[in-house]
């Protein structure tokens, strides 16, 4: 205490908050210069908590947040439209979202600052709020969440998010469900053909193409020769143009 009194000008007390492992924590630290005299866990103030979250996100990136499948898909759809059509579709790259943190994620930042776990934060809602109006009315048409294939199945479209190497939307579907499909659907107002991952009955990739006409007219014959003996219960017709598309096996048909 006497030493503290003599060096009172070196005494400092502050609440230090940090965002680690998906939560904001804080401690009250009393220091004498570089020496820690006391370190006590405390509840962070909203201001300190919010500053800690913002600092961590800007330092370590948006991967600190909990990206659900719905949020990732929504971000990928927005990224496609911004890349292909430009404004008013929003830039959802890491840099753009970090620059506008308070604009699009304000209430969620506040919830984290007040102690909410990152796993409880739904990012799909804030991202959807970035949709421009009135253009948002065409969002599902320009970048659909699902596509219907000739078998009648609705298949989810996988959109890459900013930072991934590929920029192509992908549909992964069993080959038999696409018999007769001549052209790959095109997204973003006809600018981007969907890349089809045509799968075996065991859902292993047999072909990757956005030119289905060329596939049925050429490589399909080799795929058929290799697969019909391995999967005899599934249709492998000589003429894939005339065969009915199906998700079923021969026995069930």
Q: Model-predicted segments: where are they?
A:
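Acidic, serine/threonine- and proline-rich low-complexity intrinsically disordered segments
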Residues: 1-146, 189-253
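Short, surface-exposed, low-complexity cationic segments
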Residues: 161-194, 198
């Amino acid at each position: 205490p006497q030493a503290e009194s003599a060096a009172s000008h070196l005494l400092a007390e502050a609440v230090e908050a940090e965002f680690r492992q998906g939560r904001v924590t804080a401690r009250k630290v009393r220091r004498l210069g570089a020496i820690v005299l006391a370190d006590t866990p405390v509840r962070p103030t909203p201001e300190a908590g919010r500053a800690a979250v913002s600092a961590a996100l800007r330092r370590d990136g948006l991967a600190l947040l909990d990206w659900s499948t719905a949020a990732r898909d929504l971000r990928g759809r927005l990224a496609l439209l911004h890349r292909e059509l430009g404004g008013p579709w929003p830039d959802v790259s890491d840099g753009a979202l970090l620059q506008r943190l308070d604009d699009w994620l304000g209430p969620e930042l506040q919830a984290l600052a007040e102690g909410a776990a990152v796993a409880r934060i739904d990012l799909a809602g804030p991202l959807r709020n970035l949709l421009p109006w009135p253009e948002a009315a065409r969002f599902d048409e320009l970048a659909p969440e699902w596509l219907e294939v000739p078998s009648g199945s609705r298949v989810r479209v996988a959109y890459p998010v900013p930072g991934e190497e590929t920029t192509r939307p992908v549909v992964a579907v069993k080959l038999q469900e696409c018999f007769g499909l001549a052209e790959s659907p095109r997204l973003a107002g006809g600018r981007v053909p969907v890349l089809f991952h045509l799968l075996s009955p065991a859902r292993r990739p047999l072909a990757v193409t956005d030119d289905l006409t060329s596939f049925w007219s050429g490589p399909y014959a080799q795929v058929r020769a290799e697969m019909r003996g391995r999967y005899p219960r599934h249709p492998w017709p000589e003429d894939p143009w005339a065969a009915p598309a199906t998700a079923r096996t021969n026995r069930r048909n």
